[in-house]
Amino acid sequence: MNGGVQTWTQPRLCYLVKEGGSHGFSLKTVQGKKGVYMTDITPQGVAMRAGVLADDHLIEVNGENVEDASHEEVVEKVKKSGSRVMFLLVDKETDKRHVEQKIQFKRETASLKLLPHQPRIVEMKKGSNGYGFYLRAGSEQKGWGRVGQIIKDIDSGSPAEEAGLKNNDLVVAVNGESVETLDHDSVVEMIRKGGDQTSLLVVDKETDNMYRLAHFSPFLYYQSQELPNGSVKEAPAPTPTSLEVSSPPDTTEEEDHKPKLCRLAKGENGYGFHLNAIRGLPGSFIKEVQKGGPADLAGLEDEDVIIEVNGVNVLDEPYEKVVDRIQSSGKNVTLLVCGKKAYDYFQAKKIPIVSSLADPLDTPPDSKEGIVVESKHDSHMAKERAHSTASHSSSNSEDTEM
């Protein structure tokens, strides 16, 4: 790129949109080395403009780890991707250092710098008529394909318009907290709690599609803002390429292995399930789902592994912490869970389990018309305490009635 040699200290995401039937690169294997590597980078071609370097080690294709895959398997995955493909790559020198020091790459530290579309942080101060926009449930918006809250009907000259908010923006975070799996009323409440000013992390449709292709949450953009550039030499800005409309890749295999988003409303006897864990092993899972109870109606099943509680990943959290998160949720809780077979599949494929892989939640009836985010709000906001739960433990397991 401009004759300079770039060196990165972290993995990086590169987004390629095919032009003229080509991505502008080839794949190779190296004798005596594990993995697949990039080669034959076409000068000023799609791959080069996206930030791909010769001899880059290919770590992921569209969010799926391919470090142990054969050359033929990787080629097939790229072909199946169609016109758009997302690579997680490591440059030659960084790869060499990590191999020598036996350091494993962490995908959450990946640089987002080269991606052509980025989330936006929108800071607003409330005007006399509020912020000047409507918030509507995303499952109504055809084409989004995921749960979330969409910006609509921005008033001309309003704080929202002046701050750069756009119609159809998807809200990812409110005041630094992820709202990707929260329901409509919860997001509205978070905005109102901000008082006379609020900060929204939003994505347009192109950006949302791109991050979902990588199986990355746009919320990681906050983290990327706090990390160093990750390059010894400043990388030139990538040339934006328009998003091509193409047939979706064949996802038959993944369709059989989906996580589930379940929104539970607490009943008189709690949520109607037990939370279980095996001592000494990570993870908490669902047991004893009561037929006809809130958990059953929401789609929870015995042996479901809990991935997220209200948008927070809890896979590595201690059992007691997960119990506390659910109990402190009040009358409603949103869980991202995975059946045992699906969980084992994602673990084997090294695919991170994120909410964007799940089918979106149904839109609550009272949120279909959207509500104006304005200055008026209830003065009595006290929440009822969660009722007491029964907890049991044995020598090798934990079990709490929820």
Swiss-Prot record:
GO terms for cellular component: apical plasma membrane. It comes from Homo sapiens. Residues 230-258, 362-402 are annotated as: Disordered. One of its GO terms (molecular function) is signaling receptor binding. Gene3D superfamilies: 2.30.42.10. SUPFAM superfamilies: PDZ domain-like (SSF50156). Residues 388-402 have a biased composition (Low complexity). This is Putative PDZ domain-containing protein PDZK1P1. Residues 240-250 have a biased composition (Polar residues). Keywords: Repeat. The keyword Repeat applies. Signal peptide: none annotated. Pfam families: PDZ (PF00595). Residues 12-93, 121-206, 261-341 form the PDZ domain. Belongs to the NHER family. GO terms for biological process: protein localization to plasma membrane. Residues 365-387 have a biased composition (Basic and acidic residues). Coiled coil: none annotated.
